[in-house]
Amino acid sequence: MAPVGVEKKLLLGPNGPAVAAAGDLTSEEEEGQSLWSSILSEVSTRARSKLPSGKNILVFGEDGSGKTTLMTKLQGAEHGKKGRGLEYLYLSVHDEDRDDHTRCNVWILDGDLYHKGLLKFAVSAESLRETLVIFVADMSRPWTIMESLQKWASVLREHIDKMKIPPEEMRDLERKFMKDFQDYIEPEEGCQGSPQRRGPLTSGSDEDNVALPLGDNVLTHNLGIPVLVVCTKCDAVSILEKEHDYRDEHLDFIQAHLRGFCLQYGAALIYTSVKEEKNLDLLYKYIVHKTYGFHFTIPALVVEKDAVFIPAGWDNEKKIAILHENFTTVKPEDAYEDFIVKPPVRKLVHDKELAAEDEQVFLMKQQESPARGPSGSPRTQGRGGPASVPSASPGTSVKKPDPNIKNNAASEGVLASFFNSLLSKKTGSPGSPSAGGVQSTAKKSGTEGEPQSFRSLTEQCCQTGQKTVLSNVQEELDRMTRKPDSMVTNSSTENEA
């Protein structure tokens, strides 16, 4: 079918119509070709457009809060090595519509404030507009959350001020961020939009999207860049309920303060758990949504107490006030640390109970204990005698409470018997004029006709158990024997004369 313009030309006459129709046909073809060329050019331009590079994620958090483990999990690695100072890794981003890949830089600052000067290597004045900030809070230690968030927010604010960004440029960043916060539109239920398709998610015309005024406590600390508050280790909520008697009121109080902080900075709030892999996919999608503009179709989640998600721009003070209705023992204006109290530390008492004696001291005591006598007196040993000699009395025991007194008395008795027997032996020999008197004395002492040898005396001494007497008895007997012999010889000579 010929174009309408050509049909009108044919009605003009028999000569000119053919020429006119050919000229109009050529112009129409050129117009069509230019239209197709513009369409193809636009498509090819979009196809050649790549995901922007140079995007940064800056992560703050205390030591042990799980920030490195969280980002390593988002990266797809199973185990990450803990660094020192300023850690670096990257997230792989894939645009399925354009089959394009890029990498998003991730900088993790050490939990020690000593390393905050390293931020200048991660974010500069030129790269600030391409940066997203993540504050990591440890839900297993909720009493540290608010203090930690305030501390790291102050560190970031101080770093931005040191960049000396021109005031007009900083105001542009703040206005753009405030507009994004106000233009938030909650995704409709059943929305089937591709989460990878790039572009703003809008509904209706621009005239319908009227920016609502901000509340009194909303965006009071506008940093000009998107902020994300991520609570890690949310699986510890059950432990808090069992060990620290946390109730729903405590959890609502914590959530209310977190959402209040997020309102001040225009931040989003996400509860995560690497252990249970909870909300990790949601966190990744929200990050690429805020950094690369991918469509995001997940609404706010406030039902589950350990899987909360509050996107930036959704919350307000009236929604937070719903949590206040469940407060019974605390008021919304009460200080956070007055209700979420740090549990007492019982480490000192625990260490005192487990204190052990030094191994070397214990071995020294064990080495010294066998050397002590049964009653504490030092042990003495005879010349060749045994270590202990039983007493002659069958009814007495070897160990006595105080054997010194009895041993001394026995020693004196042995010496007296020895001297008497010695005198009776020497003076009672045949031919002695005084033999009768001496023998009578010997009879009284019960030693007549029974000469006692040194062996019998030694055996008698052994029966007493006195090692001191045993060791010196031989010398004493020799000395005493020589002296009475001389006395008896002199006495016999005088009698004969």
UniProtKB/Swiss-Prot annotation:
The keyword Transferase does not apply. Its main location: cytoplasm. One of its GO terms (molecular function) is identical protein binding. Keywords: ATP-binding, Cytoplasm, Cytoskeleton, Dynein, Methylation, Microtubule, Motor protein, Nucleotide-binding, Phosphoprotein, Transport. Gene3D superfamilies: P-loop containing nucleotide triphosphate hydrolases. The modification Phosphoserine is found at S194, S369, S377, S429, S432. Transmembrane segments: none annotated. Belongs to the dynein light intermediate chain family. This is Cytoplasmic dynein 1 light intermediate chain 2. The gene is Dync1li2.
